[in-house]
Amino acid sequence: MPNIFSLICICLNSALQPSGFFFAKLPEAYAFLNPIVDFMPVIPVLFFLLAFVWQAAVSFR
């Protein structure tokens, strides 16, 4: 349980600092990956929605 609490604190601390982990820029060598990196946080939401579509396809058995 303390591990989950500390992880939440770290995430909140990083999110509150604009120059923190979540808002860091990629190095120039990886600049071509910017569109992919911008889209990556949405991927888990798509899997969540896919689960509902799948269940609707099998009539929510």
UniProtKB/Swiss-Prot annotation:
Transmembrane segments: 36-56
Proregion span(s): 1-24
Coiled-coil intervals, chain numbering: none
Signal peptide positions on this chain: none
Cross-referenced InterPro entries: PSII_PsbK, PSII_PsbK_sf
GO biological process, one term: photosynthesis
Keywords: Chloroplast, Membrane, Photosynthesis, Photosystem II, Plastid, Reaction center, Thylakoid, Transmembrane, Transmembrane helix
UniProt-listed HAMAP family: PSII_PsbK
Membership in a protein family: Belongs to the PsbK family.
Described purpose of this protein according to its UniProt entry: One of the components of the core complex of photosystem II (PSII). PSII is a light-driven water:plastoquinone oxidoreductase that uses light energy to abstract electrons from H(2)O, generating O(2) and a proton gradient subsequently used for ATP formation. It consists of a core antenna complex that captures photons, and an electron transfer chain that converts photonic excitation into a charge separation.
Protein name: Photosystem II reaction center protein K
Organism listed in the record: Nymphaea alba
